[in-house]
From Swiss-Prot:
Intracellular or extracellular location(s): Cell inner membrane
Native source organism of the sequence: Aliivibrio fischeri (strain ATCC 700601 / ES114) (Vibrio fischeri)
Domain of life: Bacteria
Cytoplasmic topology ranges: 1-23
UniProt entry keywords in alphabetical sequence: Cell cycle, Cell division, Cell inner membrane, Cell membrane, Membrane, Transmembrane, Transmembrane helix
Taxonomic lineage of the native organism: Bacteria, Pseudomonadati, Pseudomonadota, Gammaproteobacteria, Vibrionales
Chief site of localization: membrane
Ranges for domain POTRA: 50-120
Protein's name according to its UniProt entry: Cell division protein FtsQ
């Protein structure tokens, strides 16, 4: 047989009265804390608070100016506050400048951004359109920005590093004969053509490139006294070379 049990639902008024002040105090603390958090977040994200109004620029600037950097950042749709601005977006905006190779942006409390810039170093021009850095990487800066003459390199779009490496090699090999390389071209058929600073054009062809360069060096030592009259030297032979002279007289063409 199941007996019914009557639940005691009466409140202990004394106990409630005893704990009520503590509960009210705790509630006030929680509410106040939430209000402070919300107010702080609102204050820190307010565009009128902590605006990024100062900039420190570091790095050696030769081809761009501090004004170029400021204009790139000002061109963004909007610039946030110290708390809201994503530095990656600032970096992306600066990397759109053609002379910037690397950039690092940091925020400094309370209203400053620090920008460290590394410029591309121009080593040569490429296909009379753009510029190559010392690693053979092409970057799309205007050639008119160059402050001194650079060697002219030509070739298929993906060959910039190979052509630059060959130019470096020739510069070293030609030091003993006191000539420098004005331009190096690799044709679509992978044939090499070199123009020296004295205007002499070398036809090296596709094969036996290293041997033909050595052959030219030996030949040039013999012809150095006549260098001002030489138009081109064609080394696309198993042995020897054909020398083309600037004179129109075909009798001045020599076979060596």
């Amino acid at each position: 047989m199941i007996k019914a049990v009557k639940m005691n639902t009466s409140f202990d008024k004394e106990k409630v009265r005893k704990h009520l002040p503590g509960a009210i105090f705790l509630s006030l603390v929680v509410i106040t804390s939430l209000w402070l958090v919300i107010s702080t977040i609102s204050w820190m994200t307010d565009e009128d608070r902590l605006p990024l109004s100062h900039m420190i620029i570091q790095g050696q600037l030769k081809h761009i100016t501090a004004d170029d950097i400021r204009e790139a950042i000002d061109s963004m749709d909007s610039i946030g506050t110290f708390m809201t601005q994503d530095v990656n977006k600032l970096q992306d905006a600066l990397l759109s400048l053609p002379w910037i190779a690397q950039v690092s942006v940091r925020k400094q409390w309370p209203e400053t951004i620090k920008v460290f810039v590394v410029e591309h170093q121009p080593e040569a021009t490429w296909n009379n359109r753009v510029i190559v850095n010392p690693e053979g990487v092409v970057f799309n800066a205007p050639m008119s920005d160059l402050r001194e003459p650079k060697p002219a390199l030509f070739g298929p779009e993906t060959s910039s590093k190979d052509v630059l490496d060959f130019w470096h090699q020739l510069q070293k090999q030609f030091e003993p004969i006191h000539v420098t390389v004005h331009s190096v071209a690799l044709t679509e058929r992978l044939s090499w053509q070199v123009v020296l600073d004295n205007g002499i054009r070398l036809e090296l062809g596709r094969d036996s490139r290293e041997e033909r360069v050595e052959r030219f060096i030996a030949l040039y030592k013999q012809l150095e006294s006549k260098k001002d009259s030489i138009d081109y030297i064609d080394l696309r032979y198993d042995t020897g070379a054909a020398v083309g002279w600037k004179s129109d007289d075909v009798e001045n063409k020599e076979e060596n």
